[in-house]
UniProtKB/Swiss-Prot annotation:
It is found in: Rough endoplasmic reticulum; Nucleus membrane; Golgi apparatus; Cytoplasm, Perinuclear region. It catalyses: prostaglandin H2 = prostaglandin D2. It comes from the Eukaryota. Forms a beta-barrel structure that accommodates hydrophobic ligands in its interior. GO terms for biological process: mast cell degranulation; prostaglandin biosynthetic process; regulation of circadian sleep/wake cycle, sleep. Its EC number is 5.3.99.2. This is Prostaglandin-H2 D-isomerase. Belongs to the calycin superfamily. Lipocalin family. The gene is PTGDS. Catalyzes the conversion of PGH2 to PGD2, a prostaglandin involved in smooth muscle contraction/relaxation and a potent inhibitor of platelet aggregation. Involved in a variety of CNS functions, such as sedation, NREM sleep and PGE2-induced allodynia, and may have an anti-apoptotic role in oligodendrocytes. Binds small non-substrate lipophilic molecules, including biliverdin, bilirubin, retinal, retinoic acid and thyroid hormone, and may act as a scavenger for harmful hydrophobic molecules and as a secretory retinoid and thyroid hormone transporter. GO terms for cellular component: extracellular region; extracellular space; Golgi apparatus; nuclear membrane; perinuclear region of cytoplasm; rough endoplasmic reticulum. The lineage of its organism: Eukaryota, Metazoa, Chordata, Craniata, Vertebrata. Residues 1-24 form the signal peptide. Monomer.
Amino acid sequence: MAALHTLWMGLVLLGVLGVLQTQAQVQVSLQPNFQQDKFLGRWFTSGLASNSSWFREKKKVLSMCVSVVAPSADGGLNLTSTFLRKEQCETRTLLLRPAGTPGCYSYTSPHWGSTHDVWVAMTDYDEYALLYTTGTKGLGQDFHMATLYSRTQTPRAEIKEKFTTFAKTQGFTEDAIVFLPQTDKCMEEHK
């Protein structure tokens, strides 16, 4: 009986530790007093970090893309991104639905059908924004990504360093962080 009690207590403790560990993984600070109206407009995706196998395979061929953030009818955001894919410009729009605290959104992945959460962790609205995205991709594969948005195609070195520090704080290693090269292709789509 004592062995059964000890086993049960061990399982309970493992469960509690598992819950605590899961909660700790998603603790991303949000931009204090996030102002959605100031976040609207044109952004360049200048930096990425991800644990995704797709990202690791493709990161050397990725290039900067342009995104436009506009208000949606439900109080969320329409995020329309145009990027180069197979030598052609491709445009995709995501509906970011408000998910509680201002600066926190969720969207459904058109490819996987899964729900992803997006946090605007830090922004000055005029120069840069740091975002963190998490979700499940495919069969139980956790997906995490940090993104650097810049209002220009040439973010300052201090902004790049801020992004690197942010990405490492989220658990990404140096080799999982990439600054996307500029391209003239597909950049005129959202002027």
